[in-house]
Structure formats: structure tokens, C-alpha cells
Amino acid sequence: MARKTKDLAEAYPAACEAAKCKAVQPFVGALTRAVDAGAELTFVRLNGNSKELFNGRVDGKGAAAIASALTGTGTVEELDLSYNRIDDDGAWAIAQMLAKSPAMRRLDLRGNEIGPEGAARIADALASTGSSDDDDDAASTSCSLESLRMDGNPLGDDGLIALAHALRTNVSLRELNVGDCDAGIKGVTAVCVAIFEDNDTLRSLGMENPRLFTHQCEHVFHAARMLAASGVRSLRLGKWKIDSSGIETLAGYGVGASECLECLDLRCNAICEVGARSVARIIEEGETLRYLNLERNKLCDAGAVAIALALPNATRLEEIDMRSCDIDDDGICALADGIAATEPSRRPRVVRLWGNKFGELGRRRWHRLIAQSAEVGCPIACDFVITPMDATHGAEEHMDVARLDVPDDVAVNAWDAV
């Protein structure tokens, strides 16, 4: 029988005693408040960067006690243990809990100390589909996780290979983030190949900042092939060392062939003004593309011009991020002209350009574009604000530009959009 919140509150002290660890007070408080209110606990958020846990982060033993108490839960759907000190032993306990807690849907383990062995245990849980002929028993020994974040853990190639193996049989997972995990080309290739060959249920994939030493961009080919054949809608490939050749491969074999890609994050790569022609192709041929992040690629003016010419042909692009792309005033003007030439209803509603060089002409073009878009009922939210400054001492009126945060309710969140 599935455990209720009252059962969890009764089980946790014994679990702490068995694990020989102190109780995590924010968890105790959440359980107590729910029981006192006669309510059921549906989420547990124990982020180690929070004020309550900053100086007392959850370690492996603490995670084991929490996992033991949550095993078999019928109410808790989300568990956030990000930015703690959970090791492989803690991950093993969490994996055992996952295999016996079909109510659990979202697990956040970002920024911990989980290595290849712990990743393999989590992968085993993801691969579990029930092994009993009895329906009730099978349901209690299967993992129904939909979202898994393990970015910022030292998983290595072996950890990603284990998770890739699980993806071949898992049918519940919709979101996976394994970025910044000390993995190399073997690990990222294994994940891409597994999705390409055997997985059509994953929707969001993050694999940023792998340890790559190749100059051939063969890893990009595997990502492109995966995009073309899978149901992935959101893909994060930041710091993948994608150059002009790599972006050409991604555009021609991946985005152009994908029927569902909505969010593509290519920040901090090596895409230059030559590669911008392929970016323009992505904008024109990505019929479902809503979000494109090109932050910190050296596109320069020529790259900005190529992208600007493609913008009127974009189908669904809602947000474009080109911060710190070495764009001078000519490129800034070209981007304003490109959006102005786009039908108002199809213009991006969020544009990020801070970190580039706004000249006086570029400021005036963008000031006019922002005002005109607002007048026709299609406002553009930018990460900068342009303000006319009154002329003084006979000087000509000029425009001032300053940084501005884009409101959360306006921005397209690349991770939650799917």
C-alpha cells in the first residue's frame, strides 16, 4: 500500500537512526506542517544553496535516510536535492527509492558528488519496468520518473553510458540534463545514439560543457542524427566547440529534418560569421523553433547581417539571444531592420543583445522598432532600454542605452517550454 504523509513522518526518525545521521530540519518541518494541516505532501525541496541548508547540506547518509522514508510514497511527486553533498552511496539509496515509488515524477540532483557508480544505480532504476505478473506488485517495483537533472555531477563517460543504456528501455522520462558532468565524446555519443536508435519519448535534453578534444565535430553529427529521428523538443549544446563545419552539420542533418524542435541552446560555441549562414538556415527551416540561444559566439557584423536577413522568413521564433557576440553598430542596425521587415505578428517577442556595441544609429533604429512594435500590439521585450537624452548646450539629442532584465513572465524558458 502506498505511504501517506503521516507514514513518512513516522518513518523518517527511524530512518535517520538507521543511517546514523541527523534529521534534516527543513524536511521535518515540511512533514510536520502537512500532518498538522491534514494535507498530503506532494513535493520535497531541499536545495543545498537555501538559507536553511547552506551550512548543513545533505550528505550521502542524509540522502539515504530521506530516500528510505520516501520509499513507497503515494503522494510526493517531486524531490529536489540539488547542490548538496550526496555521493554514490546516497545515489544508490535514491535509486532504490525510485524503483519502489511510482508516484515520483521529478528528481533534481544537480551539483552533488555523484560519480559513475551512482549514475549506474540511477540508470538501473530508470530501466526498471516491473517484473511481477501481479499488476499491483509490478507497479510498486517500477520507476515512473519524468524529469531527471544530474548536471554538475562527476558522472564521467561511464555514468553517461549507463544512463544511455537505460534510455533504450525507459518510456517515462521526458527531461534529462547531464551537462557539465566531466563526460567526453564517448558519453555524449552514447546518449545521442541511444535516443536515435531506441527512444522516442524524451523531450528535453541538456548535455552542456562536455570534455571534448576533437576538432572534427563528429559528436555534432550524432546530435544532428538524433534530432532528425527523435521527439526531442529542447536541446542544450552549450560549450560543445561547434564551429562553422559543426553548425552546418547540425542545420542540414538535424534541425532541418526535425519535426518538433522548439528550443535550441548553442551558447558559448565557436560559431563565427561563416557559420552564421548555417544559423540563418536553422532560422528559416526550423518550422517549430521558438527559442534560439547564440550567446557568446563570435558572429560579428557579417554574422548578424546573415541572421537578420533570415528573420523575416522565421515561422515561430519567439526569442533570440545574441548577447556578447562581438556585434558592432552595423550588425545592430541590420538586426533591427530584419525584425522591422518581419510581419509584426511573427516578430520575436524577446530579443537579447546586451554585451554588443550599440552606436548612435543602432540605438535610434532599435528605439524606433520597439516603439513601432508596441503601437501595432506586438511588443518586443529586450534586455536593454533606450532612452532619448535632452540636448544640452546646443548639442544634438542622443540616445542612451542601459541594461534591463527581461521579465520572467515574458521570456521563453528553454527548459520548461516543453
Where on the chain are the PLM-derived regions?
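Leucine-rich tandem repeat or coiled-coil scaffolds
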Residues: 1-418
